Every structure is written in C-alpha cells, then in structure tokens.
Amino acid sequence: MNYLEGTIDFAGQLRCQKYMNYGLCTSAVISYIYGYLVQDSYCVIKLFLILASLVALVCLPAWSMYNKNPLKFQKKKE
C-alpha cells in the first residue's frame, strides 16, 4: 500500500476523525492541567504541540487500519 496515496474508506475516515477529535481534546486538557500545575504558559504550548504531533502521526498517514472496508465498484456494462 502506498502511504502517500491517501486511500481510506468511509468507515476509516470516521475512525480517523474520532481519533483526531478525541486526541486533540485530550491533548488540550492534559496540556492545560500540566501548565496549571507548573504555572508556565510556555509549557502548555510546548506540550500541546508535542501531543498534537503524535495525534497527527496517528491520523495523517493512510494506515491500513483506515482501509479495512474498501468500496466494491460494479463492473462496467458493455
């Protein structure tokens, strides 16, 4: 499978969107709590960027887990 091609099915798109939404919200909450505990806003930004990069690593490439239910097209009628 070519990872740069970006072929994922509709169920994979939904799964990827859920991972992205939950991952970014969780990253924001963790970053905020950590920044509150250390009383440093720079740490909030730095930790959020690190965690958002990890979420991007999970969501952006076309992993095979996002293409488990490919569409089956009908054959061309002649």
Curated annotation (Swiss-Prot):
A Gene Ontology cellular-component term: signal peptidase complex
Job description of the protein: Component of the signal peptidase complex (SPC) which catalyzes the cleavage of N-terminal signal sequences from nascent proteins as they are translocated into the lumen of the endoplasmic reticulum. Dispensable for SPC enzymatic activity.
Location(s), subcellular: Endoplasmic reticulum membrane
PANTHER family linked: MICROSOMAL SIGNAL PEPTIDASE 12 KDA SUBUNIT, SIGNAL PEPTIDASE COMPLEX SUBUNIT 1
Membrane topology (UniProt): Multi-pass membrane protein
UniProt KW keywords: Endoplasmic reticulum, Membrane, Transmembrane, Transmembrane helix
Ranges of the Lumenal topological domain: 39-42
Stretches in topological domain Cytoplasmic: 1-18, 64-78
GO biological process: protein targeting to ER; signal peptide processing
Stated name of the protein: Signal peptidase complex subunit 1
GN (gene name): spc1
Transmembrane segments: 19-38, 43-63
Organism placement in taxonomy: Eukaryota, Fungi, Dikarya, Ascomycota, Taphrinomycotina
Quaternary structure annotation from Swiss-Prot or TrEMBL: Component of the signal peptidase complex (SPC) composed of a catalytic subunit sec11 and three accessory subunits spc1, spc2 and spc3. The complex induces a local thinning of the ER membrane which is used to measure the length of the signal peptide (SP) h-region of protein substrates. This ensures the selectivity of the complex towards h-regions shorter than 18-20 amino acids. SPC associates with the translocon complex.
Family: Belongs to the SPCS1 family.
